[in-house]
Swiss-Prot record:
Lineage: Viruses, Varidnaviria, Bamfordvirae, Nucleocytoviricota, Pokkesviricetes
E.C. numbers: 3.6.4.13
UniProt domain Helicase C-terminal: residue ranges: 253-459
Record localization: Host membrane; Virion
Gene source species: African swine fever virus (isolate Pig/Kenya/KEN-50/1950) (ASFV)
PANTHER family: ATP-DEPENDENT RNA HELICASE (PTHR18934), PRE-MRNA-SPLICING FACTOR ATP-DEPENDENT RNA HELICASE PRP16 (PTHR18934:SF91)
One cellular component term from this protein's GO annotations in UniProt: membrane
Family per similarity comment: Belongs to the DEAD box helicase family. DEAH subfamily.
Top-level division of the source organism's lineage: Viruses
Top-level EC class as recorded in UniProt: hydrolase
Topology in membrane: Single-pass membrane protein
The name this protein goes by in its record: Putative RNA Helicase B962L
Length: 963
């Protein structure tokens, strides 16, 4: 096996002529040492003394040899292994978990680096996996270093790391762009401190095979002398361009792999593997199935078989059978013959992978790469803030990375499934996520870092210092969400963080909406663990709750068993339990909460019974409930992350633990439902949509509209969704439609500010970053109580904001809007439906009551403006005058709807009840109650203004009134 290019002389470019034939790694190490005071260099005075860019072809050793040799600057390679290293570390970031783990293990096992011992001098640190020394060479995902830069001081970072190597720096993920922003700001701050700070400034090395050296050098303000180019590769790669493009790349990929296999039947197993890139798991599963069928044909022809290994991030995190097959030696692997069921040695592995195998990964037995040329990533469109997974042609830089998987240990072959002409037409570089996705969850981090550089402590858009700033429309949308969420406000000199914003900016992985929802949980006294669970479900589950189902035929009814596993005990014996729960909750988010509660119950049950192999039992439980085990584990991990985030900033993650929805009883259930829905509304109010009766569509503030139809609930008047999603309509023509990801119905649960849902107002000057012209602040759609909470409902002790205390707010009381506390036995049989009232949009109702027995066919009721009602079976037999009066007092501040029945058997009861509720005003029993004018007279005499929606029928009348 040849040496990596970095260890072979004669590959240097963009260096002085006398050094062109140097061994690249020696030249690089010498270049670095010349700028280190401990090796005779001068004290750094600019970024040029601490930033180096290395552009080197794939397979050149920049991910392996370079970090090791840089570490040897700090620790001599001849140092005895028993001597513990106590100096500063070298961190080498990787964009993916697979590469971080694999590189560390490979170096620790390599005979070329006897001084690098896994767990002692080399290791890895990722979110799910960690095996690292306290000090040494540490391979880590970019997110690990990003979190450290976010939470640690400059001096703490400098004390930990002497070198930061950002491998695959061309990747433009949000986290990597933010990490580079943090690094640049840190270096500048330490340089400004003079020699005291400059002596320990970490050295930053950016490496990539396809990096735009001009863009990055301009960003860091360094010259050409800080750029080292290493050209050439040890072994050649032959590209096999097709004559024509394919219109079915999955089928073509299978055919190409089978052709390679048959035509190279004499390949040595150590030089035979095939890697096929696919954009997503759906394609991976389909291609794996086709390859399995191909194995059947090979078995019939008595030819050697292929071992098919589907690899994605989930396989790596779980270290499943496919991942273990990837890491094992080919001689230790077996494949089952589909005809004889006997096991035999495979000729080669066919690795079908997503982009997790695109960078930094060396498979020493890999000889062929098949690339369909597609890439799938999240894209977000503004101002709708609608996003989805969009499949587009991969950029040339990504294709070069894929091609670079071969030719590392021996000559390789690259099979693109597109013509050379197509390759030449696609973009050279991938679009950064800050452009395609917008700032998203890192917006507040950008704000804080920008404020740090501003002398007046305000946020100005023009001062954002990133490789690429967010697009204007994305930035305007993010600003609006931060202001509406109470995290940003306009001060005397410009935009500033509020106290809530300061707390939210300390979160590492929470978006504006997620932070706002957590804060709302404290405002409204919700169980924060429920909030964390719901946010975790939204984060993990793509598009719809039914995507939690591990079944090709997904529908809402299949969720029933999973939802019922987590509902409160008092609801479990109800007839038609799932249908009634679905009607009662009218909420995908709460159903997701119950699904997780069921999973959590299973965990506790298995632990209490001390079962062996907990994961196996949980997997079987998920299979029984038709749930994806991997998704449930991800929700569990994400939930833990959110709770940890809250604890880190000093908030109690188990606030109101006793008020969890799953532990509610008949008296508290609907109140807790209303509390959680209020939190949804506070967090996602910009994603509220109202039903337009004329267009039969839901419309929002930004003019977008979409069709939504629940399987049971018909046209609720107001819904909220965490995010709008783009769903493919036609793959052939690349068409998408807008649809809500999760739906929470607000009717009857929450007072919705209708004015807030009007088309959004323009916000002039907000992008100008200041108010120098002293113009009056434009009106913003911000609910007044947000400001009150920021100013009066929080106070902090200490400068670190570690303690957050609530102050009661007398003007904001959570209304008890049900009959639960009046008649405890009724909720067991509560049935919810929707009744259209033409005047209801003029008032904000909480919860409205009617007798279920009076409506046998709700489909006959005219659908106009939806108001939520609670059906109470035989309510007239239970509701006393005292109960009626108590109910009226609960609902009085916001109006009340009476559904009045005229059956003679109940007439006297209702008259007396109504008379008592209205303050003992006399109601004449001899009136003709079938005329609206008579009712209008009664209510005017009582000091009320009645609104009637229609002429009463023979037995029914609907009345809306407000005092």
């Amino acid at each position: 096996m040849g040496k990596p290019t970095l260890l072979e002389p004669g590959h240097l470019y963009n260096v002085p002529a006398e050094h062109k034939n140097d061994i690249p790694i020696h030249y690089i190490i010498t270049w670095i040492k010349q700028r280190l005071p401990e090796f005779g260099g001068s004290i750094p005075t600019s970024l040029a003394d601490r930033v180096l860019i290395i552009k080197s072809r794939t397979g050149s050793g920049k991910s392996t040899a370079l970090p090791v040799h840089v570490f040897r600057i700090l620790r001599n390679e001849n140092t005895h292994s028993f001597q513990k290293y106590l100096g500063r570390s070298v961190i080498c970031t990787q964009p993916r978990v697979l590469t971080a783990v694999t590189l560390a293990k490979d170096i620790g096992a390599s005979t070329h680096y006897p001084d690098m011992i896994l767990g002692q001098t080399v290791g890895y640190q990722t979110k799910p996996l960690t095996e690292k020394p306290n000090r040494g060479l540490i391979y880590a995902t970019a997110g690990v270093l990003l979190a450290q830069l976010h939470t640690m001081t400059d001096d703490e970072i400098a004390s930990r790391y002497a070198f930061m190597i950002i491998d695959e720096a061309h990747e433009r993920a949000l986290g990597i762009d933010l990490m580079l922003m943090y690094i640049k700001s840190m270096l500048e701050r330490m340089l400004q401190r003079g020699s005291i700070g400059a002596l320990r400034i970490p050295f930053v090395i950016l490496t990539s095979a396809t990096i735009d050296t001009y863009k990055y050098s301009t960003y860091f303000g360094i010259g050409k002398e800080n750029i080292i180019l290493v050209e050439g590769r040890q072994f050649g790669v032959e590209t096999h361009w097709p004559l024509y493009n394919t219109n079915n790349y999955i089928k073509t990929a299978c055919e190409t792999a089978l052709t390679i296999h048959k035509e190279n039947i004499h390949d040595r197993p150590t030089e035979a593997d095939i890697l096929i890139f696919m954009p997503g798991m759906g394609e991976i599963r389909f291609l794996s199935m086709l390859l399995s069928h191909a194995n059947m044909d090979l078995a019939k022809e008595k030819l050697p078989l292929m071992l098919i290994l589907p690899i994605d991030s989930e396989a790596i995190a779980q270290e499943n059978e496919a991942y273990l097959g990837l890491k094992a030696e080919i001689k230790d692997l077996w494949v089952k013959n589909p005809l004889t069921a006997k096991v035999e040695k495979p000729l080669r592995r066919v690795i079908v992978s997503t982009v997790v195998a695109e960078t930094g990964l060396t498979i020493e037995t890999l000889k062929y790469v098949i690339d369909p040329g597609w890439n799938r990533s999240v894209e977000t469109y503004y101002p709708e803030w609608a996003g989805g997974l969009i499949t587009r042609p991969a950029a040339q830089s990504r294709i070069e990375q894929r091609k670079g998987r071969v030719g590392r240990v021996f000559p390789g072959h690259f099979y693109p499934l597109y013509t050379k002409h197509v390759f030449e037409q696609i973009p050279a570089q991938q679009y950064p996520e800050i452009i395609t996705e917008g700032p998203g969850a890192i917006f507040l981090n950008i704000v804080v870092e920008t404020i740090k550089k501003n002398k007046e402590g305000v946020f100005k858009v023009q001062e954002i210092d990133m490789l690429d700033p967010p697009p204007t429309d994305a930035l305007a949308s993010a600003l609006e969400r931060a202001i509406v969420g109470g995290l940003l406000t306009r001060g005397e000199k410009g935009l500033q963080l509020t106290q809530l914003g300061d707390i939210a900016s300390r979160f590492s992985f929470l978006s504006i909406e997620e932070a706002r929802m957590c804060f709302s949980g404290y405002f409204w006294q919700a169980a924060i663990s429920d909030i964390a669970t719901i946010l975790a479900v939204v984060s993990v589950v793509d598009k719809k709750l039914t995507n939690l189902l591990d079944s090709k035929q997904r529908n809402g009814a299949m969720l029933a068993e999973a939802v019922l596993a987590g509902i409160p005990p008092f609801l479990q014996n109800m007839d038609n339990a799932y249908s009634n729960i679905h009607l009662l909750l009218a909420d995908d988010l709460l159903e997701g909460l119950f699904i997780f509660e069921g999973f959590q119950h299973a965990i506790i049950y298995f632990i209490n019974n001390k079962v062996n192999n907990l994961a196996k039992h949980l997997r079987e439980w998920c299979e029984k409930k038709m749930l994806k085990y991997s998704a449930m584990v991800q929700i569990l991990a994400r939930r833990e992350d959110i709770l940890n985030e809250l604890a880190v900033v000093g908030l109690n993650p188990f606030h109101q633990w006793q008020n969890r929805l799953a532990s509610a009883n008949a008296e508290t259930f609907l109140k807790r439902v209303c509390t959680l829905k209020q939190c949804f509304y506070e967090a996602y109010r910009l994603n509220c949509f109202c039903y337009d009766e004329q267009r039969l569509l839901y419309t929002g503030r930004n003019g977008i509209h979409f069709s939504y139809q629940d399987t049971v609930i018909k046209n609720p008047s107001c819904i909220v969704t965490p995010k709008m999603m783009l769903s493919p309509v036609s793959k052939q023509y690349m068409e998408w439609r807008l649809e809500p990801s999760f739906v929470s119905v607000l009717d009857g649960f929450v007072n919705v500010d209708i004015n807030f849902l009007l088309p959004r107002q323009e916000i002039p000057n907000i992008l100008g970053g200041g108010v120098e012209d002293e113009e009056e602040e434009p009106p913003l759609p911000i609910q007044a109580f947000l400001h009150k909470y920021v100013k009066t409902n929080f106070h902090f002790s200490g400068k670190s904001f570690k303690e957050l205390k609530m102050k009661p707010h007398q003007t904001i009381k959570f209304p008890e809007t049900t009959l639960i506390n009046i008649i405890p036995d009724i909720p067991k049989n509560v049935v919810q439906t929707y009744l259209e009232i033409s005047v209801c949009h003029q008032y904000s109702f909480k919860r409205l009551i009617y007798c279920e027995t009076f409506y046998t066919d709700m489909d006959d009721v005219q659908q106009e403006n939806s108001v939520e009602l609670i059906g109470l079976p035989m309510a007239a037999h239970h509701l006393t005058m005292h109960d009626f009066n108590k109910l009226y007092q609960l609902l009085k501040p916001d109006g009340f709807l009476i559904v009045y029945d005229f059956h003679k058997s109940q007439e006297a009861f209702w008259l007396h009840s109504l008379q008592d509720a209205l303050g003992h005003h006399t109601i004449r029993r001899d009136m003709d109650f079938h005329t609206i004018s008579e009712w209008e007279t009664i209510f005017k005499e009582c000091g009320f203004t009645p609104m009637f929606n229609k002429q009463p029928s023979e037995h029914e009348l609907f009345i809306v009134f407000k005092k």
